[in-house]
């Protein structure tokens, strides 16, 4: 299976969708694109250069979240391979297959346009420096961590870099727009598997302050990242990684 592109889907409850879109458009400087879907439930943010990869989905449930879409040529073959590796097929519709990882993390396969060549957008730049939504972090309960880390490496063909403390990485090719980080939750964590956005920033504190001015709520600050909550209640992190740094 060849992965042709990837998209990050931010799942936002319908009653908070417009406010969240406004916030993330202001954060990135990217304008909302044309909605698609039977109910116009999918809206991209379109960068001025490069290809879109950050989408927002209007959902009926009350809890926001994130999931990954992998673009492939053959949906059925990709879904079959994922199931052979332990995934569960949840739904099958035209142009889309919805699955859960062995740990229960939702993800999708979508049909890539034949012959399409894509390019990752460059980082936006503001007074606080460069910044970019460039990582999806999979938050996994301790008993599920190894199983899902091995699943993603086997499914994509991209190697695990090796666990350090509670983290591991899947070595995503540098031409794709976002990286995968896996985080092992504490043994006593009540949450099930979920995912969150990470942003890299040249100046983490200045970037986090800009987000607060745009309406984000501060949650906590550690030595390596600052956790915030967007106006829809979506928790995400601004990290101290150098903007554009890729782990391959």
Range-by-range predicted roles:
Residues 1-3, 12, 83-134, 140, ...:
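Vicinal oxygen chelate
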Residues 1-52, 77, 84, 90-92, ...:
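Core segments of cupin and vicinal oxygen chelate
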Residues 11, 69-71, 139-141, 198-202:
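Short hydrophobic/aromatic beta-strand micro-patches
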Residues 45, 187-188:
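Domain-length accessory/inserted modules outside core catalytic folds
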Residues 56-60:
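Conserved donor-binding loop and adjoining core beta-sheet/short helix segment
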Residues 62, 188-191:
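Short glycine/serine/proline-enriched coil/turn segments at secondary-structure junctions
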Residues 63, 73-75, 201-205:
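Short proline/glycine-enriched turn/loop motifs at strand-loop junctions of beta-rich domains
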Residues 65-67, 192-195:
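Eukaryotic phosphotyrosine signaling hubs
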